[in-house]
Amino acid sequence: MPVMRSTVQLIGLLIAGFCPVSYTYAYGALGHEIVGEVAATYLCAQAATEVEYLLDGESLGRASRWPDWIRKDPQWRKSKPWHFINVADDGRIAAVTGRPGGDVIWAIDKFSAELAEQKLGKLRRAEALRFLAHFVADVHQPLHVGRREDRGGNRIAIVIDGRKSNLHKFWDAQWLLKLDRSSHGYDRDGQIAAIRALGAGQAETLQSAGVLEWARESQALRPAVYAFSLTGSGEFDEQYRASALEISRLRLAAAGIRLAGKLNDIFCTQAGQR
């Protein structure tokens, strides 16, 4: 799996301190939006047209936030397990996906198929697009491919900037953007440009990997995710923060490029553009 190996090797260099880092955030609402905006720049013409039609002009980035908004709706409570998959450190992801209730890999396959099915109608396919965009981002967050015993880091208590939190939220929560004090901060367009630049020239390589491999990459990052020590106040040290945040930037870039690849496979092949 050359893509996964190269990704893990790059992360190893970052953690060892051989690569400069800058602060950013993980997959809160704005993180999902950025994945969608990065994807939009890699769409073929037909895919861009279909996305605009299905979303009635709403941006792919904003539409991808919808699956988090509807999780408490009784109609969509069933979607909660679709955001993640539990697997042991040495477990085979292919052996645990597709179980009753679903998981993030199962969901990506399900909504890819629904999006491609013209007979389902616009509303159903628009929902499928929103789910697909969201879950492609989720599977790139290392703790969405997590350990069952600590609920993907949710049971590991930490403190960030003086506030009680947990390991999962450090990698996933919107407020991590506050850590970006050295560059773009809350400048949405600046963040999108910075994340997009990380994937420049990598589309063909990144899109050659399948969904299982995306999840294996997240699983392979687990040693880096759990390699932390806490200060007396329960906070991470600066080296861990910097390395973790740079990993998040790389995963956001990969997620956006791969989401575009999925949409191009669905729409552009049908239109003879690939």
Regions found by a protein language model. Name each.
Residues 9-20:
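Bacterial N-terminal signal peptides
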Residues 22-135, 142-274:
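N-terminal, motif-rich segments that launch catalysis or mediate targeting to/interaction with membranes
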Residues 1-7:
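Positively charged n-region of N-terminal signal peptides that target proteins for export
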